[in-house]
Amino acid sequence: KEAYSLNCNYEIINVDMNNIISNEAEATLLIGDDALFSYHNRQADLFYYDIGAEWKVLTGLPMVYAVWVVNNEAKLDKADLKFAHDKIVQGFKDGFNNKNLAIESVLNKVSFTSEQISEYLKVLNWDFTAKHKEALLKFYELAYNNGLIDKMPKIEFVEVE
């Protein structure tokens, strides 16, 4: 809001990828496969902004796109939490070690080439550093200050050993 001097209304809709901006909207925020598809199939009359790059310019911080979340009860069972954490970490390792096989396994389910998927995986950042934590808290602060969320979430980080 402050950065672009805009007062936006947000609405969740299904997007027609051949007509990204509906007649009722002035802009569309795409995430996930829709964003990647749009990146590789740009429509000439539209402007495209990488939300992560814009966030970095505006805040100086990295964008946090996803986090692993557990409820308060899960943190009490350290053994189960460690088991789940280890499985996730091993899954990432297996995926990276077998990247080409993993890519081939989804090619018939997505609208991307193996090269596009491989390039996408190279630019993802899988770390969660102190800067990422700061960025996530800044995101929530701005969302709250702009009336997008009713209250600031209390975020608690659990160490998994």
Regions inferred by a protein language model and the residue ranges of each:
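Long, low-complexity C-terminal extensions of enzymes
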Residues: 144-161
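A basic- and aromatic-enriched beta-loop-alpha substructure that forms the phosphate/nucleotide-
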Residues: 1-8
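Secondary-structure end/capping motifs
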Residues: 76-142
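Pocket-lining segment of extracytoplasmic ligand-binding domains
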Residues: 13-105
